[in-house]
UniProtKB/Swiss-Prot annotation:
It comes from the Eukaryota. The keyword Signal applies. Residues 1-21 form the signal peptide. One of its GO terms (biological process) is neuropeptide signaling pathway. Residues 64-74 have a biased composition (Polar residues). This is FMRFamide neuropeptides. Residues 40-74, 360-388 are annotated as: Disordered. Belongs to the FARP (FMRFamide related peptide) family.
Amino acid sequence: MVAPLLVFLFSLQLCHTTSWAYVGGNSLNSNSLHASYSEFPAGTSNEVPEDAANGQDDNDDSQLTEPNDNNAPLVQSIDDETEMQFPKPIQWVSIDHLRNSIILRFQNPTPKILNKLDPEEMKRLRSLQENAMRWGKRSYESYPLNRNGLADKSSVGRMGFLSNHQVIRDSRGDNFMRFGRSVGGSGGNDDNFMRFGRASGSSDFMRFGRAGQDNFMRFGRAAGQDFMRFGRGSGQDFMRFGRSPGSQDFMRFGRNPGSQDFMRFGRSPGSQDFMRFGRNPGSQDFMRFGRNPGSQDFMRFGRNPGSQDFMRFGRASGGQDFMRFGRAPSGQDFMRFGRPDNFMRFGRTPAQSSDFMRFGRTPTQSSDFMRFGKSLDKSENKTSDLQK
C-alpha cells in the first residue's frame, strides 16, 4: 500500500514542476524576452481571469496567477533605434549612479566681442619707434558703440568708460606691467626701462633701467618718497634702502653724497642711533655700532676720535660701566672689564712698569684681592696698591 502511494505523490510533484517551467511560454521562445510580450494582441489587456479573482480555484492556481517580480524581465530588448538631436554641442557626459541617470552638459557659445584696437593705434605700436611689450590693462580698449548693447552713451558712462567719438576708452588702463621702451616715442622723455606697476606720474611702482638721465634700478614710490634704489643716483654711485637721505632712517651702500666711501646702517649721523661701516665723516677709518660717541652707550671698532687705536664695548670712559679692549686713554695697552673702582684688569698698571694681572677692588687702603704678576719690590707694590 505504501509503494503505490509514493509513486502517486512523485507523479504529482513532477506535474507541478513541469507546469512552472511552461508559464512564460513554450520552449521554442524561452530565450526571447520580447517574444512573450509580443504574443498578446494590441487590444488585449493584461487582466486576471474572473475565476482566479473570485477565488474559485485551489491554492496552487491562485499562486500561479499572482504577480511575481522575479518572473518579469529587467531589460526589454527593443529592435527599434532611437536617434536624438540637440541644438547645442555636448560639452561632457557624466553618469549619476545614485539616480541611475546620464547627465549631459551642453556648450554655451560665447558672443564674439570685437576687442581690437584702433587701426591708428595698432599701426603706432607696430612701428620701430614703439618697441613695447606690455602685460596687463591696455591704455586703449576700444569697442564700437553700436555693438553688444553699448550704443547708449549713458550706459557706457555708468560702466566706467569714457566715450570718444566712435570708440570707448578704458580709464583704468594706467595700471599695467610693461616690458620694453616707454610709450612716449623716440623723442622727448623716451627712456629704456622695464616697469612693473602703475604709471610714472606719482604712483607706487617698481622700475628697472634708466630714468631721467640716470642709470639706476628703483623699487617703490616716486623719487621723493620711500623707495629702494640700485645703481647710480643724481651724479653718485650707491645702492640705498629706505627713505630719503635727509634726516630719516635708511640703510645705504656705496659712496657718501659728500666725498667719502662708506656703508651705513641706521639713521643719519647727526646725533641718532646708527651702525656704520667705513670711514668717519672726519678723517678716520672705523666701524661703529650704537649711538653717538659723545656720552652714550655704544660699541665701536677702530680708531679713537683722538689718535688711538682701540676696540671698545659699552658706555663712554668718563666713569661709567663699560668693557674696553685696546689702549688706555693715557697711552698704555691694557684690557679692562668693569667699572673704574670695581674691575678686572689684564695688562700693565698705569703707575708702574711691573707686569701683572690683578683681580679685586682698588680702594685707598689695602684690601682683600688676588693678584697675578711680577713686581720689582714689595714697597713699590704696596704704594701702587695705595695709589689705586
